[in-house]
């Protein structure tokens, strides 16, 4: 697995102009199989607003995703995806490489062992 510094830079660039410390605190970047980078920023809300990873995934418009990273505001650097994002990635981007704090990466399946697969039904 490879560290993709361009993705980190893109996630920071997406977040920096809109980070407000309250509602927009995480940026994400995705690399598609086409090589393009798609970004997103979270929109926190008590009703469960979208995470940055989900916004970036939506912005990719169905392109197959190969790698993803999320970064926190206020210099927090790379952050791990939450459980909901891990589940969404497992279902919509199986095999995606997730960049993690400390310069490591892992396939999403390793971040959600014995996870439920939506495609298998209940």
Residue locations for each model-derived region?
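Short, charged low-complexity linear segments at domain edges
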Residues: 51-69
């Amino acid at each position: 697995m490879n560290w993709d510094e361009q993705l980190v830079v893109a996630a920071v660039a997406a977040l920096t102009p809109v980070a407000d410390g309250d509602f927009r605190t995480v940026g994400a970047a995705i690399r598609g199989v086409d090589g393009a980078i798609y970004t997103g920023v979270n929109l926190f809300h008590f009703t469960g607003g979208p995470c940055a990873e989900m916004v970036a995934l939506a912005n990719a418009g169905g392109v197959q995703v190969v790698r993803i990273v999320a970064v926190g505001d206020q210099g927090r650097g790379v952050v791990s995806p939450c459980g909901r994002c891990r589940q969404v990635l497992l279902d919509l981007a199986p095999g995606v490489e997730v960049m993690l704090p400390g310069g490591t990466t892992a396939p999403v399946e390793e971040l959600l062992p014995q996870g439920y697969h939506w495609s298998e039904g209940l």
